[in-house]
Amino acid sequence: MRSSSWRKSDQRVFIEQVRECMNNGYLLSSKKIGSGAFSKVYLAYATRERMKHNPRLSSDLRGKRHTMVAIKIVSMAEAPAEYSRKFLPREILSLNATYKHMNIVQLYETYQNSQRSYLVLELAARGDLLEHINAVSDLRCCPGLEEEEARRLFWQLVSAVAHCHNVGIVHRDLKCENILLDDQGFIKLTDFGFANWVGLKNSLLSTFCGSVAYTAPEILMSKKYNGEQADLWSLGIILHAMVSGKLPFKEHQPHRMLNLIRRGPIFRPGLSPECRDLIRGLLQLHPCERLDLQQVAAHCWMLPAEHMLSSALGAPREQDHSWSTVAPDNTEPDRDTRHARSKGSSSSSGRTSPRRPSLAQLCNTWKPAPEQ
């Protein structure tokens, strides 16, 4: 009896959502393509009328030759007040700040009422990176992706993260499940709910974010941390998962995870020395000893994927004043704390080369502006 009443309630809510989407120019399908604690993501279709009035939407969908989008519906009744006040606005603002990068999921528009918020997003139809790694591993009868494919995908991911950092955004929840693939196999970084704006490069944060398996050791130790360096640790975990088919450290308890981290990653036989060196460089226990994005871009393992780049690095950080309405994580409850970053030199001669591409080349891998 109770389950029947729940089904009727769900049907009523879905009908309301269909009506609200229709009123805003979208045909909501019943196909659910994702879900979170208090949100669901559905496949939807943009109407011709909506595309006429939304240049961002029409320019992107023209290139894709379809009208499909993903609509994320957040239940404001189920979401905690902190999520509605802090995390949802950060997600929206970070997606707006990173608009046009080809490896970051595009936000076309938002609308809301007292009960729900709707985010109209670019559709990435081939699932997430974790699903892709598992599917390829099954086909190959060997764990992980081949290094050439891992290199191609990792280039795109590094490009997306470099662009985020260049506009002052740290993601803080980088993991395989938050990296989607579109129908052409391109990476689409998503889920910016924990993203934060850092006005100064060496600002320190203190909020524990993300999944333990991808979380930097300084965060596990409850220390204040540099968000960019924490993102770099997560990149190392993701690369290891790509080429090995499994996470390098897996424990639910932070103190046990730290013990595994101190022992260092274990690599599968046959993995190239260059790839091992890059992963070790990213998974340094001490944040200041970790490779930065400039060094990642210049690493010898990355060189064969140079064709993925498009323009120039070392560009000055762009300031996005739209973030001024959202308090950075280190203002509440944290105090504004900064440190001078001392970057150690790389221990491996294979890691850097002055002839390799610079970071601006990574940051600028975005889509051209739509034609007017």
Curated annotation (Swiss-Prot):
Active site, per annotation: 173 (proton acceptor)
Cross-referenced Gene3D superfamilies: Transferase(Phosphotransferase) domain 1
InterPro entries: Kinase-like_dom_sf (IPR011009), Prot_kinase_dom (IPR000719), Ser/Thr_kinase_AS (IPR008271)
Keyword annotations of the record: ATP-binding, Developmental protein, Differentiation, Kinase, Magnesium, Metal-binding, Nucleotide-binding, Phosphoprotein, Serine/threonine-protein kinase, Spermatogenesis, Transferase
One GO MF term: protein serine kinase activity
Post-translational modification (record): Autophosphorylated.
Family annotation (Pfam families): Pkinase
Top-level taxonomic group: Eukaryota
Low complexity bias locations: 343-358
Enzyme Commission number(s): 2.7.11.1
Catalysed reactions listed for this entry: L-seryl-[protein] + ATP = O-phospho-L-seryl-[protein] + ADP + H(+); L-threonyl-[protein] + ATP = O-phospho-L-threonyl-[protein] + ADP + H(+)
Domain Protein kinase: start-end pairs: 27-302
Cofactor(s) essential for the protein: Mg(2+)
Annotated region (Disordered), positions in chain: 314-372
Binding-site positions, ATP: 33-41, 72
Biological role: May be involved in a signaling pathway during male germ cell development or mature sperm function.
Alphabetical list of PANTHER family matching this protein: MAP/MICROTUBULE AFFINITY-REGULATING KINASE, TESTIS SPECIFIC SERINE KINASE 5
Protein's recorded name: Testis-specific serine/threonine-protein kinase 5
Organism the protein comes from: Mus musculus
Highest classification ranks of the organism: Eukaryota, Metazoa, Chordata, Craniata, Vertebrata
